[in-house]
Amino acid sequence: MLSNPSTDIGKKELDIYLRELGKEYRKLAGKKSPAEIVLIGGGAILANYNFRTSTTDVDAIIHAASAMKEAINRVGDKYYLANRWLNEDFVRTVSYSPKIEEFSQFYRQYSNVLQVRTIKAEYIIAMKLRAGRKYKNDFSDIIGVLMEHEEKNEHISYGDIDRAVINLYGSWNAITEEAKTFLKDVLSCKDLAERYAELRGSEGEMGLL
């Protein structure tokens, strides 16, 4: 009997799947066909932070030979993952900007052909502000990113975020007033861990956990 498709991808699993993807892609496309994947959203957060334990799918920007599609499917079949566990649907959302890749950073390389990159912290925050979805985890993700950087004494300032918003979207015009107010509030918060727990609790009541 076939297993039900897995709907949650954790940090450890993400690395396993990307490693397998590198192997499968190399088998199909050869060692002279390099590929690049830029992890966006939940995937970027899983790769770089510990506050988020899982994501239901991995949003990415993919530059690769046509064999990548088959490689993705093979990994999905091997690990009983949901269809489109790794996809480019993000490019059709409001938070997408063609400039995002300019502000990505190296994460890991697999099988000497697949380079995986992620998005810098302030750009993750900028995209979450642009999305501003209450039915997702956008606001709690912002706090989580700020919180973990504070714990490492790597302060993210309003200026850093402002620069990211301008670089991606040209101005703050597309950011809602609610999102702007939220950002100012959390940047002045003295206990981000407590604020994060409170917001996650309210998201849990809405069925977002």
For the regions a language model picked out, list residue spans one by one.
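Compositionally biased terminal segments of proteins
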Residues: 1-209
